[in-house]
């Protein structure tokens, strides 16, 4: 296959999947003609490239489930007027941006440049404004659905409105390593019929701040590896009504292989249907 034909075929595959690769316009309907886009997905940060998120969710939620999603990493699109165009907000990104630049995905290793580059400020800035936190809160309270993944718990320390919607704050995470995800509520529509599963991923530890009855699953390092003073396990998923809307959080999500675990894909698709009140 030539490079040109590969690009052409890839474009056809994206169109078939129903993905919007453009930033959302003034009206979500403009992307698909008269067919309204179901979800806005705000994804991608320094440590989580938007491409892998779009690829992973494009398969699981768009192609396999059939919903339409506007994927974007443009933070300014998280506004109350824009959210009104959607039924569902999906987020997989942390709370920081790095306007001064950074050395690499992990900031590790020596930087070689000839001639030398000027030193730059590698200081993170917390991006979510008070108004954006309120916009998310009002969107869900008024009937919208929210599916939060993985590292959104890093937004909570700097935004109380978002923290209240999400229901948790990060306790950070160890490096990539295998762990088991155990289903603790097998009767909820999101986890019904789903088996425990194992992934190699970042095991995110969180401080969960809502009623324990909403917990769906927990992550456990069965090799006995701990994380700081948090032990070997953490709450890894929950779901609850929030005002007229619904919120679900799912912890795995640092790599495609975790997002595409067959049991986890069931959970993600069920979470979307539950958030949209289809189950």
Predicted regions: what is each one?
Residues 45-48, 75-77, 95-98, 152-156, ...:
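Solvent-exposed loop/turn segments at secondary-structure junctions
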Residues 7-28:
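N-terminal export signals
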Residues 38-42, 83-156, 244:
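Short alpha-beta junction capping motif
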Residues 34-35, 62, 157-246, 251:
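Catalytic beta-strand/loop cores that center a nucleophilic Ser/Cys/Thr
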Residues 1-7:
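Twin-arginine (Tat) signal peptide motif
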Residues 32-37, 62-63, 67, 110, ...:
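Extracellular ligand-binding/catalytic regions of CAZymes and related secreted enzymes
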Residues 27-88, 95:
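Aromatic-Pro/Gly-enriched surface loop or interdomain linker
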């Amino acid at each position: 296959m030539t490079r040109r034909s590969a690009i052409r075929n890839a474009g056809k595959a994206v169109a078939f999947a129903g993905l919007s690769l453009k930033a959302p316009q003034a009206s979500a309907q403009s992307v698909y003609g008269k067919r309204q886009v179901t979800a806005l997905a705000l994804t991608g940060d320094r440590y989580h490239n938007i491409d892998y998120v779009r690829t992973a969710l494009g398969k699981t939620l768009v192609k396999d489930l059939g919903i339409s999603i506007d994927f974007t990493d443009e933070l300014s699109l998280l506004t109350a007027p824009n959210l009104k165009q959607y039924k569902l907000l999906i987020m997989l990104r942390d709370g920081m941006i790095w306007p001064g630049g950074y050395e690499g995905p992990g900031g590790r290793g020596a930087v070689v440049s000839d001639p030398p580059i000027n030193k730059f400020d590698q200081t993170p800035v917390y991006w979510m404004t008070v108004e954006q936190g309120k916009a998310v809160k009002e969107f869900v309270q008024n009937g919208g659905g929210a599916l939060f993944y993985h590292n959104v718990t890093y937004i909570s320390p700097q935004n109380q409105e978002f923290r209240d919607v999400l229901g948790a704050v990060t306790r950070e995470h160890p490096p990539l390593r295998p762990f088991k995800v155990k289903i603790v509520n097998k009767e909820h529509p999101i986890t019904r019929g789903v088996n425990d599963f194992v992934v190699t991923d970042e095991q995110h530890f969180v401080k969960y701040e809502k009623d324990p009855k909403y917990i769906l699953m927990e992550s456990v390092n069965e090799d006995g590896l701990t994380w700081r003073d948090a032990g070997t396990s953490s709450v890894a998923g929950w779901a609850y009504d929030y005002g007229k809307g619904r919120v679900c959080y799912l912890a795995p999500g640092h790599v495609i292989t975790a997002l595409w675990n067959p049991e986890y894909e069931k959970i993600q698709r069920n979470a979307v249907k539950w958030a949209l009140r289809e189950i």
